[in-house]
Amino acid sequence: MASGWIGVLSAELHFPEAHSLKEKRMYVRSAKEQLRNRFGAAVAEVDHHEVWQRARLTVAVVTREAGEADRLLADAERYLASREWELGQVGRELVTLDDD
């Protein structure tokens, strides 16, 4: 029996309205805060740190059941798709934490 699940979402974001790193960082900060507050997720910017119109975020959740992790990631993806930036390539993965 599994003791828990880790859900990971990787999302490429494009900020067509950002004209500087400062503007991009405002978008990224907002996205990270909202993902943490709404979904209880851990969030990190993992790529494109010095590119002012792109970012790659990795979002992680830990739950007791696979369905809950999958639902949280789907909700997080929908949230990212509904914002003022463009959502690019997205990947999702669920990993079980075995009792062994």
Protein language model features and the residues they cover:
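Short, charge-patterned binding micro-sites
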Residues: V43-R64
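Short coil/turn motifs at beta-sheet boundaries
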Residues: M1-I6, E50-R54
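N-terminal first-folded block
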Residues: A2-A42, Y79
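Residue-level signal for beta-strand positions within conserved beta-sheet cores that form or flank
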Residues: F39, A55, E86
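Solvent-exposed, flexible loop/coil residues
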Residues: H19, R25, D47-E50, G91, ...
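Short, flexible active-site-proximal loops enriched in glycine and acidic residues
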Residues: A42-V46, E86-Q89
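A structural signal for short, well-ordered beta-strand segments
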Residues: L9-L13, L57-V59, V90-L94
